[in-house]
Amino acid sequence: RSPGWENLNVLPGPAVDHVGDAVDLGRFAEASFAEVYASHVLEHFGYNGPLLKALKEWHRVLVPGGVLRVSVPDLDVLAHLLLQRHRFDVNQRFQIMRMMFGGHVDAHDVHLVGLNAEFLAGYLQAAGFETVQRVPRHGLFPDTSDMVVGDTPISLNVNAFKPLTVAAASPAPAE
């Protein structure tokens, strides 16, 4: 637990304030939070709908100018590491593969999408975020966002900002 933060998780636990699905934040009003932090969450949503829906929900609950701090396994980095047979033995490469596809220790520990900087930025922009910035680390919590394999950080950490104002719809053309 960290003061000032509320924790949502799909599974109950001692540090969990809200049990639920991060794709449906209907329990929270629009513009409820100045910041949303999600470390190694997005890869658990399918790329064909749920991922974008989750990002739109997170956008909805942020105040104008709010920041989404996201960390995901960096598919480009993991793919590069997986191919380094001279550096990692088969067991180590198997663990890298698990970082790509999930540990499969329970029904929720499965990765349904791989994200790199380009893919993640596209999803964030499609959800309405602007000014997507890559950051070396978030430093908010001791979690997987700081994970390294060998000496290589494996997480893609970004901040994405909700615009201060939403562009008004254009008026209908006069007849």
What are the residue ranges of the model-derived segments?
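Conserved SAM-binding motif I beta-strand of class I
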Residues: 7-8
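Short alpha-helix immediately C-terminal to the canonical SAM-binding loop
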Residues: 15
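Conserved SAM/SAH-binding beta-strand->alpha-helix loop
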Residues: 11
